[in-house]
Curated annotation (Swiss-Prot):
Domain of life: Archaea
Annotated positions binding Zn(2+): C7, C10, C44, C45
Keywords: Cytoplasm, DNA-directed RNA polymerase, Metal-binding, Nucleotidyltransferase, Transcription, Transferase, Zinc
Record's protein name: DNA-directed RNA polymerase subunit Rpo10
Keyword Transcription part of the UniProt annotation: yes
Reaction equation(s) it catalyzes: RNA(n) + a ribonucleoside 5'-triphosphate = RNA(n+1) + diphosphate
GO molecular function, one term: DNA-directed RNA polymerase activity
Chain's role: DNA-dependent RNA polymerase (RNAP) catalyzes the transcription of DNA into RNA using the four ribonucleoside triphosphates as substrates.
UniProt similarity note: Belongs to the archaeal Rpo10/eukaryotic RPB10 RNA polymerase subunit family.
NCBIfam families per record: PRK04016.1
Organism in which the protein naturally occurs: Pyrobaculum arsenaticum (strain DSM 13514 / JCM 11321 / PZ6)
E.C. code: 2.7.7.6
Length: 65
């Protein structure tokens, strides 16, 4: 739900890269190339960004009022 700030496995900071990654992928670039350009070579870091799903908008409709 919340963007990953650090890689869950190795602890590398990723929060500052997520907005760039998302913007470039939505623009049509291949995710693998974007991750290469961002300098993410470890598969654990790549997995953390690629597997993230933003569910916050879906969850907010169930907010207790």
């Amino acid at each position: 739900m919340i963007i990953p700030v650090r890689c869950f496995t190795c602890g590398k900071p990723l929060g500052h890269l997520y907005a760039v990654f998302k913007q470039r992928v939505l623009a049509g670039e291949h995710p693998g190339k974007v991750l290469d350009d961002l300098g993410l070579v470890r598969y654990c870091c790549r997995r953390t960004l690629m597997a993230h799903v933003e569910w916050i908008d879906d969850v907010l409709i169930y907010e207790k009022r």
